[in-house]
Structure formats: C-alpha cells, structure tokens
Amino acid sequence: MHDHTGFKERIDEVLVRLADEEERALLGLHAELSPLSEQLRRSLACGKRIRAAFLYWGWRATGQPDCEGVIRAAAAMELVHAAACTHDDIIDDSRMRHGQLTAHAAFAANGQRSTALAMILGDLLMGYAGHVFTSCGLPGAYLARTVPLWSTLLRETMAGEFLEVLRTEARADRAPLVAESLEVARFKTAKYTVERPLHLGGTLGGGSRALLEAFSGYGLPLGEAFQLRDDLLGTFGDPARTGKSNLDDLRDAKPTALLALTVAAAGPDDRRLLAKLVGNPELGEEEAAAVRELMERCGARQQVEDMIRERIGRAGAALDLAAMPAEARSALSGLAATAADRSL
C-alpha cells in the first residue's frame, strides 16, 4: 500500500532545501530581500502534495522504479501550485490559506506594497518550478520529451484563471451556467492538478499513447470532482479545518457549479435574495447562512455531491481498464478517494 505520508515528507525535504538555498542566494544579493525569502519559505511549507503525487505515480505507472530524480521532478509541481495560489489569492483578495496569511496579506501586515510584492513572489515560484524540474537529475532525453507538456500545462492553467475572472465580472449581467463553470474547473483545476502531472510523469517514464489516454480518462473527471469538492468546501467548509474562508466565494460571486445550480433552481424571490447577497464584499456570516440554506433547500448542494460521485465513478472505470503495475493502480485509486472525500 502506498505511504503518502512518507512520500509527502520526501517532497517537503526537496522544498525545504530549495528554500534554504534560495534564502542564501537572495540574501547574498541584498539584505532587504529577507521578506521575499521568508515568504517563499512560508509558501512552500504547507500542502498535501497531491500534484506531486500524480506526477510520481504517472512515472511509476510506466514501470519505472522509485528514484530521487523523479521525487525532485514531482516537487516542481508543488512550485507551480504555490505560484498559482499566490496569484489566485491576489486576484480574489483571499486573506487566509492553510490557516495562515496569504502572501499579499502577509506583506500588507508588514506595511509593504502587498500586491506588487506578492506578484513578484508568484513569478519567482514559477521560475523555480522550471529550474527544479530541469535539474532533477533524470536523463536529458527523458526531460526533452516533456517540453511541449510544460507549455500546455501553463497555457491551460492561465486560461482557466482568465476565464474565471471574466465570468466572475460577468455575474452582474447574467446567471452563471453550469457548463461554463465546469469549463473553468477543467482548465483551472482538473488539468493542472491531475491530468497534466500524470502526463508529465508518464512522458518522463516513456509511457505509451494508450497509457496517456487512460490518464486523461481518469484525470479529467477526477480533477473536476476535486474542484467540485473544493467549491463545496469554499461555501460549506469549516475554516478551522480547511484553513481558508467560507465567505470568499460568495463575496466574490465565484462562477461555481454550486452557484449556477442554485440560481437555476431558485424561484423569483430566491433569485432576488441571491442578487442582493452574492457578490457583496461585505457579506457576513448571517447572510452567508441564508445563501447556504437556499443551496440546501433547492437541492444544489446534493446535485454537486451527485456530480462528484459520478465523476469519481468514471475515473475509477478508466483506471480499471488501464494497463499498469498493481502498486501504481492502488496508489491512484487511493488518491481518487482522497480527492472525493475531503472533509467539510
């Protein structure tokens, strides 16, 4: 059985070493870069390392053995994620992640130009991702196979973020559509969280076209399920357990499937209530409770749960048909369960 805790510790070690190396390098340039190095370390300190795990098991699914080179390559996915989170938190003005201040909120707390400094940090993290991946120690011929995939991963991730911003701003003009919400989820989360890390690992390992197609059949529905669960956590989750606000998505009128289903099922009076409350940056807990009650009452929350269950089933069916070592299959099955069952 796969020991994810032990795997996570190995990824954490790579990231701690990177933070140590970059602290020395940055402070060697100038002492005033200390806040940047400190926030870099904080940005890499937390996380479940799910994206790293998918790259690793994409590699192992090709029959390749465990090695330190692929651990370092997998750690690069966590740098991509940290960069994306840093920029996403700026866009959403989210103040908390993993129970601590986000980068721009931490810079602001120190009286610094928070948005500008956090943008620089996000760019730096993305740059480190490429460095860690290309210096992982795997053969150059293996790495060369993945070059097109890196461009694809970054393009799709930015496309998802861009579309989400556009559709959040369009909220005042018309109700969100479920299909559009899922499209954003596919680009912003499903591909860069599951499918593309699997493709990177599989391509590094020399996997067949059939295996990579199986990864898509498993990864896309699983990634959508992951985002749908995240949407539920973003509204119904306990901040003490999730480490982030359960008001931000409602305040920002995020174009989630949960909101789209709620609007579609709501009657005229409830739609007026939603128009009044959702998108209000001053929304408080009492108003949020009224929105949550409506989401429960109209069946939107249960519909999202059903969508998650259906997608997990599709992912499992695709995994069952894929040819790969038993250990890799077992690990990917376990990761699917983790993505689906994250606690509220």
For the regions a language model picked out, list residue spans one by one.
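Transmembrane helix-loop-helix
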Residues: 133-151, 274-275
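Short hairpin/turn module used for nucleic-acid contact or packing/dimerization
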Residues: 289-344
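A glycine/threonine-rich phosphate-anchoring loop and its flanking beta-alpha core
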Residues: 112-113, 120-138
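Acidic, Mg2+-coordinating active-site segments of isoprenoid diphosphate-utilizing enzymes
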Residues: 57, 61, 86-109, 130, ...
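A short glycine-threonine-serine/GTX helix/turn-capping micro-motif
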Residues: 116-118, 179-189
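Conserved N-terminal diphosphate/IPP-binding helix and adjacent helical/loop segment
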Residues: 1-82, 86-111, 162-179, 240-241, ...
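Alpha-helical scaffolds flanking conserved acidic
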Residues: 53, 65-80, 144-149, 211-222
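Short alpha-helical scaffolding segments that buttress acidic/His motifs in well-ordered protein cores
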Residues: 40, 44, 74-80, 150-157, ...
